[in-house]
Amino acid sequence: YTPIKTIGLCHSVQYCSEPLLKKLGMDDKVDGLKELIAGINHMGWLLDIRDKDGNDLYPEIRRRAAEKNAAEKHADMVRFEYIRRFGYYCTESSEHNAEYNPFFIKSKYPELIDRYNIPLDEYPRRCIKQIADWKKEYTELSQSAELTHTRSREYASRIMETIVTSGVYKIGGNVINRGNLIENLPADACVEVPCLVDGDGIHPCRVGRLPVQLAAMNMTNIN
């Protein structure tokens, strides 16, 4: 490793719990929610989710997710199937999760693509839209001096602000699994865990052991 201090960032952590609750009609549980997310990048697990009063939201999430998958086709069917099979929700989108495991995209079982509403051309479609959006933003930036900016939920600027101002901020970061941050994943693997940021830098938090089925899924990608 180089002497440069680095941390891996992804926005799937901060865009996990709130959209999940809204998809399931649980908008009233968003304010004050508490969560624990850990695993590996693009395969982090929502291990615990509670409302502002400390009530476990998973029993209701599991019930509603099963009902929604049985009742209609929607954009998150793969991850809701994860909830049914593994008991937990995954941070990364359903279209990507279908690519990260051997269960859904099978040449011998093409009917699974339709059953789980998997968009095989999602990434090229997203790239086309991004390029169009960038061109639009360039035109707006070059022709207007009065544009306003709304800060996104991406971590980078908030990390810099917190270190400079000696504040405290929590992120989900990707770091080497030193000190058994996740006990049942390899010590030299890169894991995604909660991290506290302050004036002294970034401090990964120990999670302990993942449920065995979740660790096994992570290992298919670590391997």
Annotated model-derived regions:
Residues P3-K5, S12-N223:
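Long, compositionally biased stretches enriched for glycine and/or charged residues
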